[in-house]
């Protein structure tokens, strides 16, 4: 695959330290617990502005990127026809291409606000998804997203969630 390029004229949401502090460790802890429950050994989850989590299972290496969707409460709202992942994450797909081998995988997890479910989106699905501008209450004008039809993603059940721990 050719490297994904920035979109001319597109904007990225400003970094919000308070949102990061509230969501990053919770999202990582939630998916680390899920991965460990499914036989993964966690190799790295330190903040390094790269993949959120690196794990190993059965000789395969998995890279995971995690994101909270606090607006998602209860069952998925089927009027939300797609899951949106910020296009700025294309940098991770490019980085993954540098380390990609037959036994490496990249998954994006979009986690429900109470941490009881998540959508798992494989890099191959993300790569073929439509990229376009989106509108919404928290979306900056000009910000682009991958638009993934939710029916094509994998809904995973997360034990009891971790929200009650915070």
Task: Name each model feature, range by range.
Residues 43-46, 54-56:
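Short secondary-structure boundary/capping segments within folded domains
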Residues 10-18, 25, 29, 37-38, ...:
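Catalytic cores of nucleic-acid endonucleases
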Residues 37, 102-105, 110-166:
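Non-catalytic C-terminal interaction segments of nucleic acid-processing enzymes
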Residues 35, 53-74:
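Conserved catalytic cores of phosphodiester-cleaving nucleases, focusing on short active-site segments
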Residues 58-61, 90, 165:
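N-terminal cationic leader/targeting segments used for protein routing and processing
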Residues 49:
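Beta-rich catalytic cores
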Residues 1-8:
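Charged, low-complexity intrinsically disordered tails and linkers
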